[in-house]
Amino acid sequence: MSSLNLDDFTDLIERPDGGVRRDAEARRERQVVPPGSLGRLDDLGEWLSAAQSAVPVRPVVRPRVVLFAGDHKVAELGVSARPAGSAGELVREVLEGGRPVSVLARRLDVPVRVVDMALDCDPETLPAEVAGHRVRRGGGRIDIEDALTPEEAEAAFRAGMAVADEEADSGTDLVVLGDVSVGGTTAAGTLVAALCGTDASVVTGRGGLPIDDLAWMRKCAAIRDALRRARPVLGDQLQLLATVGGADLTAMTGFLLQSAVRKVPVILDGVVTAACALVGQRVAFRAPDWWLAAHDSGEPGQAKALDRMAMEPLLTQGVKVGEGAGGLLALPLVQAAASLAAELPTTADGEAVTDGE
């Protein structure tokens, strides 16, 4: 029997400090630029202040990109434009600096950490720090079999928690969370459809490397078949992840929840992270207060998940590539919001703040 009790997260996760947020709002009202004139940057600064329990808000100085990687056997059905089992090649390209997330991370001077959970490649071909948390090689074909055994699901969830603890202990003050997977959006679509009670066609998108109509129909059919297997286990989130999630998505869910426990804010990237966040919300309803939706990728599953969590993405650029690239685009906005909240001068007490002519 599993010793992991997900119900504990309900008690362990607190909301960002509401009193501090009110103090941040009061400070904002005294600044020389009228409240509301900075749009969502005002909200971002106040959210970050509450997450840090600090007024004025501290600058984000140690952000990090964390990418969980895995291959999904469902890709053998032709649901992805990439060959099944090829996520390891993407990981190597990320590490060598040739993927969009690598370019953006260099531009923004943000380190990138890749965590192999279930790549279908020899772990000896990867750096030890990448492969150290691997649970298995590849994942089960979710339309006909479980993605993970119960033991593997617990190990993956605990690995995600451990990575969150490692980041918090190392001083990371904000995480951009993403995935590197082939077939991952099919698993994500299944989770979203199951948790939102909707049909497969509503959540089936084209993926990071767009697929044609025939592949879309195969993907929709795979999600439909996986949904039949997911619905009986909706009451047990760890079993749901074992049934149709996979090691990378299970680890991301554990990472998100433990980051909320450790009070480390997380920027969500695309549909895969949104699906994991939706599972996390089912586990602990306060957890999403620690997460920020970076962008609208145009993937219908992401839109459905964010709507269910009442999260509004910061950007709409149609970035579907995944791998944390869209999440990184939102990081400068968060950093700008923190700088504005902390550095704009305040007026003297009682002095009215007015718009410039």
Swiss-Prot record:
Pathway: Nucleoside biosynthesis; alpha-ribazole biosynthesis; alpha-ribazole from 5,6-dimethylbenzimidazole: step 1/2. It is an enzyme of class 2 (transferase). Keywords: Cobalamin biosynthesis, Glycosyltransferase, Transferase. GO terms for molecular function: nicotinate-nucleotide-dimethylbenzimidazole phosphoribosyltransferase activity. The keyword Transferase applies. Its EC number is 2.4.2.21. GO terms for biological process: cobalamin biosynthetic process. The active site is at residue 323. It catalyses: 5,6-dimethylbenzimidazole + nicotinate beta-D-ribonucleotide = alpha-ribazole 5'-phosphate + nicotinate + H(+). InterPro entries: Nict_dMeBzImd_PRibTrfase, Nict_dMeBzImd_PRibTrfase_bact, Nict_dMeBzImd_PRibTrfase_N, Nict_dMeBzImd_PRibTrfase_sf. Catalyzes the synthesis of alpha-ribazole-5'-phosphate from nicotinate mononucleotide (NAMN) and 5,6-dimethylbenzimidazole (DMB). HAMAP family: CobT. PANTHER family: NICOTINATE-NUCLEOTIDE--DIMETHYLBENZIMIDAZOLE PHOSPHORIBOSYLTRANSFERASE (PTHR43463:SF1). Belongs to the CobT family. This is Nicotinate-nucleotide--dimethylbenzimidazole phosphoribosyltransferase. It comes from Streptomyces coelicolor (strain ATCC BAA-471 / A3(2) / M145). The gene is cobT.
